[in-house]
Amino acid sequence: MKGADPVFMRILIVRHAEPDYVHDSLTEKGRAEAALLGKRLSRIEASAYYVSPLGRAKETASYTLRLVGKNAVTLPWLAEFRGYTLDHQSGKKRIPWDYHTDEWVRHKQLLDRDDWTDDPLMLGGNVKQIWDETKDGMDVLLQKHGYRRQNGIYLCENNTDETIILFRHFGIGMAILAHLINVSPLPLWQGFLCVPSAVTTVVTQERRKGEVEFRCVSLGDASHLLQEKQNPSLAGLFPECYNGIDSTDPNKWPAHEEAQAILK
């Protein structure tokens, strides 16, 4: 006898489309990406939409929201992860990802889900404050949907099959995912990329009645672009080969006709 269809909540963590960082908006390519993303997400019955207050995320979300005829709730903490560290040599502010591997890999404390913010590499800035804000923000949001965090799991009286969609940025997205699956965000920040407009899917597992765990079933899925033979943007990725420009913004790289072929 065929079993009943599984019931699980889905959280779709969506990165904004290709950004124009100078104007906090989307590039022409980004608008095309957002339109294809909108077609994809409009086929999903979502119960709620949440969006970062930043322009590039709002513009990305607008393509989906117009198609479904709904509004999104703006959450200030969904803005790109605002935590920063202080460079031990220059004293200048740094974002807590995009470190060179040899700068962080020997810091084993950075892999500790509870104490990574106390590692010397993370001290001097406000990383712990923003990490706490991120965790609290996500837990408050989930509590509104019936899930209360306790000791790394979420308690719920009635697990549902609703879907919620978050339009956000790479750094904050990986921080959210890390919190949900109980790991430090450092290996996610340093070792993974979600290309612009990519969708990360997290679902619930209720292995004990009333106790829910989250599991990531898809990270950085850009199938809506590939199906339309659109190459994903490389924004967020450093150059494959050294070119003298240490930037994740492809618009700053020297022209290279092979660059966009990396993710075909």
Task: Please give the residue ranges for each predicted region.
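Mobile, glycine- and charge-enriched loop segments
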Residues: P6-T27
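Short catalytic helix/loop segments, enriched in acidic residues and glycine
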Residues: L26-L41
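Conserved beta-strand termini and adjacent loop/short-helix elements that scaffold enzyme active sites
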Residues: V14, L75-W77, V217-L219
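Acidic, low-complexity terminal tails and accessory targeting/binding regions
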Residues: K2-V7, F81-I95, Y99, I153-T163, ...
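Active-site metal-binding loops of divalent metal-dependent hydrolases
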Residues: A17, F170, G220-A222
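Beta-strand elements within well-structured catalytic alpha/beta cores of enzymes
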Residues: R10-V14, Y50, D161-R168
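Internal catalytic-core helix/loop-beta-alpha segment
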Residues: P120-I153
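Phosphate-coordination/substrate-recognition cap region in phosphate-metabolizing enzymes
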Residues: D5, K39-D118
